[in-house]
Amino acid sequence: MDRKLIARKIAEESIVLLKNDSHLLPFSEGKMVAFFGRTQIGTLYSGNGSGGANVVGCGTILEECEKRGLMAEPLLKGFYQYKAETEPVTEQDEFDWTKVSEMVNSGIMYEIFGKYRPPLEEYEVLDTLIYQAAEKTDTAVLVIGRNSGGEECDRHLTEDYYLTETEEKLVKEVCTHFANVAVVLNVNGLIDLSWIGKYPGIKGLIFLGIPGEEGAAALAEILTGQVSPSGKMAVTVAEHYEDYPSAKYFSWDKE
């Protein structure tokens, strides 16, 4: 069997549908959707460190959804494409020198020769773009991305496990102006999900994780009903971080 078909099959059977109120999903062919979140176009396919992979040529979430008949709201699509082209991810973006002491304290050679990977900063979307998109459709897909988590020194509570201020603002704006919102978690590890229940407009929730080279294609097939999601979570998602038994003891700092 072709390796891409194998990769897609694995991804299709791994993606988890956590919420689908009012039968929001699947979307019908030709439906216009407002796509939000930088990882819709800067999709995360693999982890980092020993879990890293060459992902050149892999389709993005936006590209694969369009291939399967969804219409991306054009103004938002243009905005995210422009930001990706003019603000590409650099080595500097993936290294935070303020965390060097944490890397040393973590005591692993990977952190010395590797790098701390903070979550990439979410793009701030102009209010006018959101308003104009909401006039064309009542449906939005919001992709939350986390590239951190390759090593324990990567994970932090503030602006990592919890949403960043920019993400919180984006979630609020999207849920204010769109009646039907599906959130996709393109994350290399769990994040706080307590905010999901605060917004009635969030009717769909999908755990994509880090799905491999064909993950975006698999997600698109699930969003459009070509594949029925069958994945199950391998971990328990606590309502509050403090509910995890290891919360008091887990840290990047081994000292």
Model features per residue range: what roles?
Residues 115-122, 158-161:
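Short, flexible loop segments at the rims of nucleotide/cofactor-binding pockets, characterized by
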Residues 1-49, 54-71, 76-116, 186-255:
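Secreted, periplasmic, or luminal enzymes acting at the cell surface/secretory milieu
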Residues 125-128, 168, 186-193:
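Alpha-helical scaffolding within the catalytic cores
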Residues 44-47, 144-164:
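Glycine/threonine-rich flexible loop motifs
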Residues 171-178:
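Surface-exposed amphipathic alpha-helices with a cationic face
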Residues 137:
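An anion/phosphate-binding loop that grips the pyrophosphate of nucleotide cofactors and donors
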Residues 132-133, 198:
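Structural alpha-helical scaffold elements that stabilize or flank donor/cofactor-binding regions
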